[in-house]
A protein has these predicted regions:
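Active-site neighborhoods and metal-handling regions in enzymes and metal-associated proteins
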Residues: 1-368
Length: 368
């Protein structure tokens, strides 16, 4: 099912990287990387990719047939008790004579630290290495199939944002706004959407929608809509102004939009992300918002809403170079205005030869 040859080619590219680094095999337990190599998001994933030869997938006994059909991987080994899963993986490593084994060190659903620690205890003869950078070396640059899915996810973001704007009214709770967006997106085919809502004067970044925080007249409402299609995400943020707009809020919005354009213009192949960040910091300081800005203007988008490069929480990623085929969300970091709320406008872009092409489409100036 899906695109078996596409996923086999990804496995082969990864195997070449493993061989170059002297790694005998890699165990994939992160949901997004399992999907990258198999085309399937399957809970409790376990995939063993040797540097040479066919991959092995480990599945719950009664799921094995469907896993084989959906992934196209013929070597499916089963378990019924959790201990049998570890025994099966350890046995495959011993049988393969693997001495150096990679793990995807990532904080993600189903990437269990307990499994990792138990693996090291059971397989003391094995040297364990982090293969997350190798996987993301592949995942950061999208192919045409991935970009097409992200384009379709972008259209869903627009539908979700329209539902959010319609729902924003004085007295409505953040949770009620989010509920309308979730309903719209899931009815449209988004399986795992994410929605964040911050109604001023509350100041929260990446705000989980709260039932007791309500939209108030005269304050901004910032809405983040992340929709997925075919497993791939697009990410969009807009700020809705409710009632009369204060001069301070309007000025902050105008400055943020200037920064949004500056970042968009800076996302060209060959650009170092930190250099764009410096330009943004200079602008915010010149305009009087140096103490209101948050460092980290962009992040990757793909099988995760936020994936490498993540310039907010992983400082080394700020040294990464923009490449053609990357998909990035910008301007990610908001302006936080105590007593007013949060100002943020964010879009998803694909990097082409001549610069960033915006994929998410929705108007910027939103007033209710």
């Amino acid at each position: 099912m899906g695109q078996p040859e596409l996923h086999r080619s990804r496995v082969r590219r990864f195997q070449r990287l493993l061989e170059e680094k002297g790694i005998d095999a890699a165990i994939i337990r992160t949901l997004s990387s399992f999907a990258y190599f198999t085309g399937v998001k399957w809970l409790r994933p376990a995939l063993l990719i040797p540097s040479e030869g066919d991959p092995i997938v480990f599945a719950f006994e009664d799921e094995a047939q469907e896993v084989e059909e959906r992934t196209g991987i013929r070597d499916v080994r089963t378990w019924r008790r959790v201990g049998e899963l570890m025994a099966g993986i350890s046995g495959a490593i011993r049988d393969g004579g693997f001495k150096v084994v990679g793990f995807d060190y990532s904080l993600e659903r189903d990437a269990y630290v307990l499994f990792f620690e138990l693996f090291k205890k059971v397989n003391r003869q094995v040297e364990v290495r982090d293969v997350h950078p190798l996987i993301m070396e592949l995942r950061m640059v999208k192919d045409e199939h991935e970009i097409e899915l992200i384009k379709r996810a972008s259209k869903l973001c627009s539908r979700g944002m329209e539902a959010a704007v319609d729902a924003v009214e004085p007295g409505v709770s953040e949770l009620e706004v989010a509920a309308e967006v979730y309903h719209t997106l899931m009815k449209a085919g988004s399986r795992h959407p994410l929605v964040y809502v911050d109604a001023g004067p509350s100041v929260r970044i990446h705000a989980e929608p709260l039932p007791d925080v309500r939209v108030r007249r005269g304050y901004p409402v910032t809405v983040v809509v992340a929709a997925d299609y075919g497993g791939y995400y697009a990410d969009m943020t807009r700020t809705v102004f409710v009632g009369l707009l204060s001069e301070d809020a309007k000025k902050a919005f105008d400055v943020f939009m200037e920064a949004h354009s500056l970042a968009e213009d800076g996302l060209k192949p060959g650009t170092i992300l930190a250099n764009v960040q410096k330009d943004l910091e200079r602008l915010f300081h010149e305009k009087g918002y140096g103490s209101n800005m948050v460092i980290g203007f962009a992040h990757g988008v793909g099988l995760l809403v936020e994936e490498d490069p993540i310039t907010t929480i992983v400082p080394p990623h700020r040294r990464y170079q923009v490449k053609k085929g990357m998909v990035l969300a910008s301007l990610h970091a908001p302006l936080t205005l105590p007593g007013t709320g949060v100002i943020k406008v964010e879009d998803t872009y694909v990097i082409e030869e001549d610069g960033a092409k915006r994929l998410t489409e929705y108007e910027y100036e939103l007033k209710k």
